[in-house]
Amino acid sequence: MAEVITGRQTATVDDDVVVFLIGMRINRLRRVHTEAVIQDIDIPIARAAEFLAFLHADVGVLPIWICPIRAPAPGTDATLYPLPRGTLSINFGFWDTVRSREPRERGFVNRKIERKTTALGGVKSLYSDSYFGEDEFWSIYDRGAYEALKARYDPGRTLGDLYTKCVLRQ
């Protein structure tokens, strides 16, 4: 619960949930489809302008965080996050809700971003919603390296695999 300096109680988490649910209901009644787009995408610097143009033209999210990053040096063990070693990339971070009057399948905009990222040789952080097919996911995130770590640190398979957690959200 939040309190102001006087100690008087203000909005609670329950109030926030009610406002959110009312907003969703209003959108449904108005036939507005919404999709949360929360992503961190790393694109090689040579293709960064193309990705930014795509975000503006095809996605329309604002604001966009733009930050240069350098991948680990060649020979460094970091195969689960597949940026080309020693290269400079641009990280694009964006958090917004995209609205449309056209009915869309779940994850439509996020999937469009994933396809563009892959086409430009980029990689996406997996903390956000992901919609990759399983074969595509493992072609990007090195199943062999992941399985080697899994065999060593979770040989009994107590915890789910990366695809199940990140894409299927189980």
Give the positions of each predicted feature:
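C-terminal substrate-recognition/cap domain of FAD-linked oxidoreductases
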Residues: 1-109
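Activity-critical C-terminal alpha-helical subdomain
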Residues: 24, 105-111, 115-170
